[in-house]
């Protein structure tokens, strides 16, 4: 695989910038373009982020998206395309300078960044898309804009050739925490933080907001899977000259929440509605207790106020089937539960394909 261009980043000169507003891993079109998720994402931007940007914008501020604008690498729904373009057009009305760094979910071929879904955003005024590395001097600081690179050795050579104050990129840094389970990024394409030398790094790719040595993952704007339960999400703004950051926490979007039977029993229905509205609520309970407590009526009531209400067995963590036409809970097929599990555990596409093939194979034998 030849990626010689990685050794020769483009150098440009820019000045008079105030701050950088970071976005990363927006994943528009999540879960096969499901309307509920797209509505949640676009509502957050239209109701919270864009008004915030209009209020807090300072002359010279730029907007940098650190990759994975979209979720699906090959198929994007028409509504997702229209909504995403609409949001970036609104960004363009605020910012005179918008940079989008290509992420691994934004490219069709894993070995090349040339075919990218971000191409549809290039014609929006003030938007620059980075498919190749670019070094720019802003307010006296040297900044490397580094898109996704699928070849570790090429990336190491690139970093060795550049002495940057800041690196903005879509990066897989070894040792960073992937999610609340504590598992670390250790893939064969992970790059060691020492390769960044003394550069301060702001990155997308890993969804959990965190600081690791000189690397700062800005995290997703909102929660997308149960693995992100408990994460603090929002928007990070960097003052390049001083190095200081401001964080605007997202207190608007739905969150995942795990609760016990005791938390349910100690609250009134009114308190449950108020405290957990707009949540994906997972109730963990023993199967025998579920039968005794007769949750059907409560489930029917709460489904009108929660984004989702699932009951899990404490013994094996399986979802207890509460589906029926009477209680208003959406009935899911076994295939849908498998898809939900794969999405919640952020399985890569190759492994996902193998798991689905194995499921189909053994399902026929049951």
Write out the residue ranges for each language-model feature.
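Conserved catalytic scaffold of divalent metal-dependent phosphoesterases
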Residues: 84, 106-192, 218-221
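Active-site environment of divalent metal-dependent phosphoester hydrolases
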Residues: 29-31, 71-74, 101-111, 151-153, ...
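Conserved beta-sheet core of the metallophosphoesterase superfamily
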Residues: 179-245
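Accessory, non-catalytic peripheral segments of nucleic-acid enzymes
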Residues: 58, 240-366
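Divalent metal-coordination and catalytic microenvironments
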Residues: 25, 68, 84, 103, ...
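Core catalytic region of metal-dependent phosphoesterases/phosphodiesterases
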Residues: 18-19, 26, 30-135, 194-198
């Amino acid at each position: 695989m030849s990626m010689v261009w990685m050794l020769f980043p483009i150098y440009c000169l820019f000045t008079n910038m105030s701050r950088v507003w970071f976005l990363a891993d927006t994943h528009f079109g999540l879960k096969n373009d499901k309307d509920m998720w797209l509505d949640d994402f676009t509502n957050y931007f239209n109701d919270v982020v864009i008004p915030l940007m209009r209020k807090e914008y300072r002359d010279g501020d730029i907007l940098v998206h650190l990759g994975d604008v979209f979720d699906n690498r090959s198929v994007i729904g028409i509504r997702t395309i229209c909504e995403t373009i609409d949001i970036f057009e609104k960004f363009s009305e605020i910012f005179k300078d918008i940079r989008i760094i290509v992420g691994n979910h934004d490219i069709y071929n894993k070995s090349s960044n040339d075919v990218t879904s971000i191409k549809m955003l290039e014609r929006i005024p003030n938007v620059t898309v980075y498919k190749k590395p670019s070094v720019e001097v802003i307010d006296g600081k040297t900044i490397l804009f580094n898109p996704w690179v699928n070849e570790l050795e090429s990336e190491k050579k690139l970093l060795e050739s550049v002495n940057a104050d800041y690196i903005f990129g879509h990066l897989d840094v070894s040792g960073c925490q992937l999610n609340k389970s504590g598992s670390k990024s250790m893939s064969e394409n992970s790059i060691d933080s020492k390769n960044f030398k003394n550069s301060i790094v702001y990155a997308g790719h890993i969804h959990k907001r965190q600081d690791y040595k000189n690397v700062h993952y800005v995290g997703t704007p909102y929660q997308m899977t149960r693995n992100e339960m408990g994460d603090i999400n929002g928007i990070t703004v960097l003052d390049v000259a001083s190095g200081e950051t401001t964080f605007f926490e997202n207190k608007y979007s739905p969150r995942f929440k795990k609760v016990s039977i005791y938390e349910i029993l100690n609250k009134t229905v009114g308190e449950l509605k108020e405290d957990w509205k707009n949540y994906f609520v997972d109730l963990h309970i023993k199967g025998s207790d579920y039968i005794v407590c007769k949750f059907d009526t409560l489930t029917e009531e709460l489904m009108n106020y929660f984004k989702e209400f699932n009951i899990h067995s404490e013994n094996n963590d399986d979802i207890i089937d509460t589906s029926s036409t009477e209680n208003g809970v959406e009935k899911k097929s076994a295939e849908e539960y498998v898809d939900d599990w794969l999405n919640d555990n952020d399985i890569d596409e190759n492994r996902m394909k193998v798991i689905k093939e194995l499921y189909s194979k053994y399902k026929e034998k049951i």
